[in-house]
């Protein structure tokens, strides 16, 4: 990595070079559109949870590269809810890519933000240290019973799944099952990756999870070009999923 002074000098030079028409479009239209789509998801969740209050507990985030969604969650929820925010990430980038998750955009080690860098970004954004917890490690190793018991019995108000890959999403969904309560919103950030193939990625992991647990009742919530959200309604076997917060 280049020293920070050289990086800043290079950025200054780049800012003085005229943008191409394509670069101007990406900066002016495409990037703000992607940001606004995700912001719409968070505002919709805030509206839903406020109308249906109280739904309290955790904001659980699986995949926290660059702290973008964590900071957006804080901005969207802090004025209305007393959530505790939990970032669960390898902080080493993507794991080794299994055959079922092959797509050109995914590479082992890609999308890496270190834990200290993540925390610095969040704290500079105004998130208090006592409202934010991190859990480090790849999900097939880090989502243990000990970690689960560390956070229970409090439930989740929001679960944000941004782990990209089918093989990463499987352990995430099994982990969060115990944190569901009536009104929990679960969001899939990469719902339409893998060409929206229902047999790939987060779509497949979600379908198989629902097939394994038919007693869990979810309803469609909101969607964008890439994200999809559901609401947990309750247990079909008779429980309503209400829990301690």
Question: Where would I find each of the regions flagged by the language model?
Answer:
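A short alpha-helical cap/connector motif
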Residues: 1-187, 191-245
């Amino acid at each position: 990595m280049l020293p920070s002074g050289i990086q800043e000098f290079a950025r200054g030079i780049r800012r003085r070079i005229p943008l191409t028409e394509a670069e101007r479009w990406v900066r002016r239209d495409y990037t703000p559109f992607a940001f606004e789509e995700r912001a719409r998801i968070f505002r919709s969740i805030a509206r839903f949870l406020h109308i249906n209050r109280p739904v309290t507990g955790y904001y659980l985030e699986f995949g926290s590269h660059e702290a973008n969604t964590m900071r957006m969650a804080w901005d969207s929820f802090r004025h209305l809810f007393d959530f505790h925010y939990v970032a669960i990430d390898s902080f080493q980038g993507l794991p080794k890519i299994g055959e079922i998750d092959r797509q050109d955009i995914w590479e082992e080690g890609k999308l890496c933000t270190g834990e200290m860098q993540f925390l610095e970004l969040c704290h500079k954004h105004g998130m208090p240290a006592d409202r934010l917890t991190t859990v480090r490690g790849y999900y097939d190793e880090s989502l243990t019973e000990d970690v689960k018991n560390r956070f229970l019995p409090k439930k989740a108000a929001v679960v944000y799944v941004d782990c990209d890959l089918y093989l990463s999403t499987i352990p995430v969904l099994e982990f969060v099952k115990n944190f569901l309560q009536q009104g929990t919103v679960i969001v899939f950030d990469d719902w339409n990756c893998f060409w929206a193939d229902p047999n790939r990625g987060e779509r497949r992991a979600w379908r198989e999870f629902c097939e394994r647990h038919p007693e869990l009742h979810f309803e469609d919530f909101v969607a964008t070009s890439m994200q999809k959200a559901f609401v947990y309604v309750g247990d079909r076997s008779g429980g309503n999923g209400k829990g301690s917060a």
